[in-house]
Amino acid sequence: MQQTESPILTVPATSTLSSPEVATSADLREDFLKALRCMILSRTLEEKLGSLYRAGGRIVGGVYLGRGQEAFSASAGINIRLGKDIYGPLIRDQAGRIAYGEPILDCVRTHLGAVTGPMRGRDGNIHRGRPQEGYMAMISHLGSLVSVVAGALFARRLRGTLGDCAGATSIGDGGTSTGAFHEGLNMAAVEKLPLVISVANNQFAYSTPTTRQYACEDLVDRARGYGAEGYSVDGTDLLACIATFKKAFARARAGHGPQMVVGRLLRLGGHGEHDDASYIPDTIKHQHEGRDCIEVAKKQALKLGWASETDLQTWEEEARREVDAAQAIASKEPAPDPYRETWRALSTHELIEGQHG
């Protein structure tokens, strides 16, 4: 399949939106502004986490950031209903987590190993969630979350509680080559489950370029092989991403089976903060996909008259205050006591000493 100038390419082709059509959709304004504020907060939070990691101290393990992927992630997150839908985010989905409704204090507590966090200090950083609420903790084995979220949807169907619930999970270009990804997507397609898969094609699976990962022209081609509906979108264009995910979630909820959204973008940093990404050529960094999606979104907001320079500055200041406040709280909270803890990371409903249910 050949790339087009349109920000959105649909397979099978049900509609194609051009940039002007997307930009003049006033009904996207509320979602756009919510997503943009989530992106700003996410970037501010991740800059703080990166700084704490480099300084050494309480953050144990790796720090994985979503710089460059915020627009794609947040656009999915604003469509996922907290406490109703099922969400299984991946390592670069901080913007999506915020848009979904996760308090940033949960993130900071987990990174600092506080016993008050959702993982109670037993599992760290990106491996956090509240499964009893439909918020799945990330699994390091890439592709596995596709089956987990699909299985959770199938379980609700069997129990008669599915209703208009949708499930969503994320994966990168490299993860789409795993067996778990294919098994999960195949099951979801056969059962016509309301699953939306966000594929962040950030050009590298750690240090392996896409030219060494797959031979199809666009990863969205893989959706067709399973009978799923697929969309290829400019992952740096917030307006296009919002319009695409809005449609994908609507079709999933309406019974059209799994939807796969592929975002074309670039990871603006290393695999983690330990990685200098020196293997990424400058020629790729300067391509269209290398644009900073937050700067693109700010320009869109100003051009459309949806926000002013003062608004943007205010949101950035508010984000800094919120992040600083979360750090101040979590920094004073204790780590788990190894002599008194059960080390059951996901027993989040049993924070009272002595309860082991």
Describe each model-derived feature in a short phrase.
Residues 134-332:
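Glycine-rich ThDP/TPP pyrophosphate-binding loop and its adjacent helix/strand module
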Residues 47-191, 209-215, 220, 225-227:
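Cofactor-binding active-site loop characterized by glycine-rich and histidine/acidic residues
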